[in-house]
Structure formats: structure tokens, C-alpha cells
């Protein structure tokens, strides 16, 4: 189980599998290039959406703010408005960046732009739902993981709650490539920075020394 009470992931092990030559995807020995292309498309799917302005996670934040702002003192409300304004600007910058990336990717060859969107959206989602938890205060501690309530068909009672979204957002910087991996990609492929030292770069996988 995940911290949300969901079970979204599993491992599959295949033994003695042989792939017919006619089913080879891409060039023989070029599997990594195919895998990287797949990952680029996944990252675009995870972080490259172009929603309408003010929708998605930022809409959740605005809704809970409108609902709870009256319970805050003037100083706390002022601090919250500053934090909300900053996140709204980031959300709009991400939306427009994704729009430009989508236009650039219509050539059919996804580039590192997907890593930009994935990195920004993952970290922004976490910041948004962290702020939501700050707004609701101690109520944030009352979420039940719902192991016995998740019916296994994706219709868990908790899926629409802010507390569920906060817990689920913790995975955003891991799935589809960690934020650390995204920064490496952007540093090396976009900014042209020197790559990490790799002593196994020109060694076949089967020949890489293992403990």
C-alpha cells in the first residue's frame, strides 16, 4: 500500500522470454534510445498538459482559500495571499511554457522540454498542496488512509479530498523520473553542462561490475 491507501504499482518478472526478430522495435542494440523516447513522452504526459487558466491544483488552492480566509487574522491572511500569488504566477508560467513545448513537439520528436514541464509541475503540485494543508491547519492530520474503504475500482471516497491530493503529490517528484534526474537532463542537454562521470559509459550492461 501507498501512503494514500492506494495500490497503483507492481513489479512483473518475465523468465525465458524470447522476442521474434520481426517484433524488434527500432534497431537491434538500440533499446536504450527507444526507452528514452518512451520516457520523454511519459514526462510530457505527466507534466506537459495545457489546462485552462486557473484550473487543476491551483483551483483547489483558490477554493480552500476562499472558504477559509475569514478564519485567519490579518497578518496570517497577508502571508497566505503572498504565497498564493507566488504559486498562481508559477502555475501560469508553467501553463504557458507547456503550451510552447506542445507547439514545438508537433514535429513528432519530443525533446527535453518535457523534462522542464515535468520538473516544474511535480514540485509546484507539492507546494500547492502543502499550502492547502497550512490553510486547513490541524484538520490536515485527520486523513484516514482508507485501506478498507478503497474499493479497488478507483472510486475511493478519499480521492477528491485535499488531504489525499497532498499525500499523492509526494510521489510526483519520483514517478516518471525524479527531480534530480530531470535537473541532470536539463543541465546536460539544454544548458550544455558537463555530465556526471560514468565509468561504465562504454561498457555493455552485462559486463558492468556488480557487488
Predicted segments with their positions:
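Active-site lining segments that contact anionic ligands and/or coordinate catalytic metals
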Residues: 9, 58, 91, 111, ...
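Glycine-rich phosphate/cofactor-binding loops in nucleotide/flavin-utilizing enzymes
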Residues: 29-51, 140-211
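Short, well-ordered loop/turn and helix-capping segments at boundaries between secondary-structure elements
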Residues: 15, 19-20, 41, 67, ...
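Glycine-rich beta->alpha junctions and the first turn(s) of the following alpha-helix
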Residues: 1-97, 172, 206-211
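A general structural signal for short secondary-structure junctions and capping/turn motifs
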Residues: 2-6, 133, 164, 177
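Flexible loop/turn segments at secondary-structure boundaries
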Residues: 5, 21, 111-112, 182
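C-terminal helix-coil-helix/basic helical segment that borders enzyme active sites and/or dimer interfaces
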Residues: 74, 78-81, 92-154
Amino acid at each position: 500500500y501507498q501512503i494514500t491507501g492506494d495500490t497503483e504499482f507492481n513489479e512483473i518478472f518475465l523468465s525465458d522470454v524470447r522476442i521474434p526478430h520481426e517484433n524488434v522495435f527500432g534497431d537491434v542494440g538500440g533499446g536504450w534510445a527507444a526507452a528514452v523516447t518512451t520516457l520523454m513522452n511519459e514526462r510530457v504526459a505527466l507534466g506537459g498538459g495545457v489546462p485552462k487558466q486557473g484550473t487543476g491544483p491551483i483551483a483547489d488552492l483558490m477554493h480552500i482559500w476562499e472558504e477559509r480566509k475569514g478564519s485567519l487574522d490579518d497578518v496570517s491572511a497577508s502571508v497566505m495571499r503572498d504565497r498564493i500569488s507566488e504559486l498562481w504566477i508559477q502555475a501560469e508560467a508553467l501553463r504557458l511554457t507547456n503550451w510552447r513545448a506542445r507547439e514545438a513537439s508537433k514535429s513528432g520528436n519530443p525533446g527535453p522540454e518535457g523534462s522542464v514541464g515535468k520538473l516544474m509541475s511535480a514540485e509546484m503540485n507539492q507546494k500547492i498542496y502543502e499550502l492547502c494543508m497550512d490553510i486547513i491547519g490541524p484538520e490536515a492530520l485527520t486523513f484516514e488512509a482508507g485501506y478498507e474503504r478503497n474499493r479497488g475500482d478507483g472510486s475511493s471516497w478519499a480521492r477528491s479530498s485535499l488531504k489525499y491530493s497532498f499525500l499523492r503529490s509526494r510521489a510526483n517528484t519520483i514517478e516518471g523520473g525524479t527531480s534530480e534526474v530531470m535537473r541532470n537532463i536539463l543541465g546536460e542537454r539544454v544548458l550544455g553542462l558537463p555530465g556526471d562521470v560514468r565509468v561504465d559509459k562504454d561498457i555493455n550492461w552485462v559486463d558492468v561490475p556488480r557487488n
